[in-house]
Amino acid sequence: MVKRAMLITFSVNSEKFESCYERNKFFRKLYGWKQIIIKANKKYVYQREGLLHKVPHIKVDQSSFIVPEDECEKIIKFFEEWTDKVIWKNFKVLLEEDFEEV
């Protein structure tokens, strides 16, 4: 069975971000991040979720991933918020049975 999906690829235009903080904010919202807090000689590790933790996907490359067609609206909406700072494209693809995990 063939499954419809979207390949999404993006490139960050670093000069358009006001600061490194804002650029990191983009990546954290998309991928999530690991937070480590050291307090009273104890180490607390938290995994903060990003958008891709909530959407099934296959990571193709550092800035490319495939999402099911019915889930792509969330991703497109996210990238539209960053359009002036991030160049992105989406392409319709068909996945064969081998990629049913998406």
PLM regions and their residue ranges:
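Conserved short beta-strand edge segments in small beta-sheet-based binding/regulatory domains
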Residues: 83-99
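Basic, often amphipathic N-terminal segments
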Residues: 22-30, 34
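Generic structural motif
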Residues: 13-15, 70-72, 93-98
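Short S/T/G/P-rich N-terminal loop/turn motif that feeds into the first structured element of a domain
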Residues: 1-24
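Glycine-rich loops and low-complexity Gly/Arg-rich segments
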Residues: 31-36, 89-93
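Short, intrinsically disordered low-complexity segments
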Residues: 32-83
